[in-house]
């Protein structure tokens, strides 16, 4: 807090100073200083004289000859104190931001992350916004909990000029733990060997002709020693790259990436000029099996036979030709996959079907179903998110032709106030779900929490804000216009998300 002094000149220069933390205190005229009875104001002044605070200084040009001038000077001093204190208080005020309750931010307002709730939080500025990203599996091992961390990932830009778009492979290293230490915490923490290192970002880029709507990395990148990455372009083409040379360049000094590595190894042109968003690699077919769905309701199946890629000429089709917004392969059945449609339907398909039609169609929403996620741990659970900000979890054992019209989600939440843009089950914890939304947040949910839990009830009774929050909500992360969210399977609890303000790499204390 700044310090100023109050200076009063009468027959001779006299200085009466006061320090105050939360009150403005007028000076006492020198002539009255001896005889004035101690009133409440003086008692307050006496109590606070030794505390830290502000000293208001007013320099008189001339002698103050009457009480009116003195009173005017005192009022000016008091106004300055109050103004300074008011501005200081504004800077210190911290409010809890809840997307379903809080007002929109003003033009001069920003949200700041609370560092005490993050174990790790790093922001990566990008040359252009990125609509999609994926984590590249590495050989550094699983269950990595010590710091600093290293991450390989790939993303693609949305440039204002098409020819400036790029497919980017990023190596992020020296990602230190950012959780603030407690004062009582020892300095020799074995888990935090190098807390003060600076993060390092390396990148290898591949030029693109158009914006990439969606990209996916094959889950067999380590075992097959190739990083198969599919991208779905807004021009309708689906490109398959092998990003192994780019990944190798980060760990092999002097390695020269072949020119051929900057070109796709295969291009799916069956979609014509129709763009799309549905894209997924099979987690069970190691040789490579890719599904791609477009905005005209057509889904193409591409497989690798020996060294040659083949796309089935006959697509799987939706009868109403509505857009395929997302695709997910089953984690347990190699021929089964699910799609999300802009007509509000979740459909279950089988690649063995000669009719190339869905086996089951369930009305999941009255608006677009934007994204779906198949649980890695529980093969019959599927999560979905729609354009209204509602997301839910479905038990696929209830998806039968005779019951299709009566199926209801086993859990459903309307916490978000913007379209759901990404959803993902935690691959290491079957009860945790990450949800990204256009309301500028990524939320983490624990489906194992029961609403009638006594501890939850007590917390809600003590805190008004908690009464409006679903008990399953674990965490709210702020990021501008979130587009995609991915879990890192080898670093428990770590997420990577992309928005219009760049990439975030983060891990909370909640997961």
Swiss-Prot record:
Record's subcellular location: Nucleus
Entry's Gene Ontology molecular function annotations: unfolded protein binding
A cellular component annotation (GO) from this entry: nucleolus
Region annotation Disordered: where it falls in the sequence: 1-67, 181-206
Keyword set includes rRNA-binding: no
GO biological process terms on file: ribosome biogenesis; rRNA processing
InterPro entries on file: Glutamate-rich_WD_repeat, Histone-bd_RBBP4-like_N, WD40/YVTN_repeat-like_dom_sf, WD40_repeat_CS, WD40_repeat_dom_sf, WD40_rpt
Placement of WD repeats on the sequence: 319-359, 364-404, 415-455, 477-510
Bias kind Basic and acidic residues: ranges: 1-22
SUPFAM superfamilies recorded: WD40 repeat-like
Pfam families with a match to the protein in the record: CAF1C_H4-bd, WD40
Sorted UniProt keywords: Nucleus, Phosphoprotein, Repeat, Ribosome biogenesis, rRNA processing, WD repeat
Record field: compositional bias (Acidic residues): 42-67, 184-201
Modified residues (Phosphoserine): 5
Coiled coil: none
Keyword Nucleus: yes
Subunit structure: Associates with ribosomal protein L3.
Function comment: Involved in regulation of L3 expression and stability and plays a role in early 60S ribosomal subunit assembly. May be required for proper assembly of pre-ribosomal particles during early ribosome biogenesis, presumably by targeting L3 onto the 35S precursor rRNA.
Protein name listed in UniProt: Ribosome assembly protein RRB1
Species of provenance: Saccharomyces cerevisiae (strain ATCC 204508 / S288c)
Gene (name only): RRB1
């Amino acid at each position: 807090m700044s310090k100023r002094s109050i200076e009063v000149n009468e027959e001779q220069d006299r200085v009466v100073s006061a320090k105050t933390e939360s009150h403005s205190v007028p000076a006492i005229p020198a002539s009255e200083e001896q005889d004035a009875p101690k009133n409440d104001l003086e008692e307050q002044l006496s109590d606070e004289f030794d505390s830290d605070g502000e000293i208001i200084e007013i320099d008189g040009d001339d002698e103050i000859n009457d009480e009116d001038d003195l009173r005017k000077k005192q009022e000016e001093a008091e106004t300055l104190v109050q103004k300074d204190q008011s501005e200081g208080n504004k800077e210190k005020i911290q409010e809890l931001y809840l997307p379903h309750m809080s007002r929109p931010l003003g033009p001069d307002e920003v949200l700041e992350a609370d560092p005490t709730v993050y174990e790790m939080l790093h922001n990566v500025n990008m040359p252009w916004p990125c609509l999609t990203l994926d984590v590249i599996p590495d050989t550094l091992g699983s269950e990595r909990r010590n710091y600093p961390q290293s991450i390989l990932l790939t993303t693609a830009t949305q440039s204002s000029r098409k020819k400036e778009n790029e497919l980017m492979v990023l190596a992020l290293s020296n990602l230190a733990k950012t959780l603030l230490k407690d004062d009582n915490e020892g300095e020799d923490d074995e888990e935090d060997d190098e807390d003060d290192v600076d993060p390092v970002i390396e990148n290898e880029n591949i030029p693109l002709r158009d914006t990439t709507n969606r990209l996916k990395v094959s889950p067999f990148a380590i075992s097959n020693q190739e990083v198969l990455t599919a991208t779905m372009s807004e021009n309708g083409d689906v490109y398959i790259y092998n990003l192994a040379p780019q990944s190798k360049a980060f760990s092999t000094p002097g390695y020269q990436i072949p020119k051929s590595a900057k070109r796709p190894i295969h291009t799916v042109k069956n979609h014509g000029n129709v763009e799309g968003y549905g894209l997924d690699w099979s987690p069970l077919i190691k040789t490579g099996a890719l599904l791609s769905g477009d905005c005209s309701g057509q889904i193409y199946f591409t497989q690798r036979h020996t060294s040659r890629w083949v796309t089935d000429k006959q697509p799987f089709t939706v009868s109403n030709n509505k857009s395929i917004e997302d695709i997910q392969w089953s984690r347990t059945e190699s021929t089964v996959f699910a799609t999300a449609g802009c007509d509000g339907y979740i459909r279950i398909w089988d690649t063995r079907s000669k009719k190339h039609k869905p086996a089951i169609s369930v009305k999941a929403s009255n608006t677009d179903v934007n994204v779906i996620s198949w649980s890695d741990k529980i093969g019959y659970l599927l999560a979905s998110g729609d354009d209204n900000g509602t997301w839910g979890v479905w038990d696929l054992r209830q998806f039968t032709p005779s019951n299709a019209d009566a199926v209801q989600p086993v859990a459903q939440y309307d916490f978000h106030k913007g379209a759901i843009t990404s959803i993902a089950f935690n691959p290491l914890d079957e009860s945790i779900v990450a949800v990204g939304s256009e309301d500028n947040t990524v939320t983490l949910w624990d489906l194992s929490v029961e609403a009638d839990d006594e501890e939850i009830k007590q917390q809600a009774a003590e805190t008004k804000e908690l009464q409006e929050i679903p008990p399953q909500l674990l965490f709210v992360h702020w990021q501008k216009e979130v587009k995609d969210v991915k879990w890192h399977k080898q670093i428990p609890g770590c997420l990577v998300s992309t928005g219009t303000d760049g990439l975030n790499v983060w891990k909370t204390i909640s997961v």
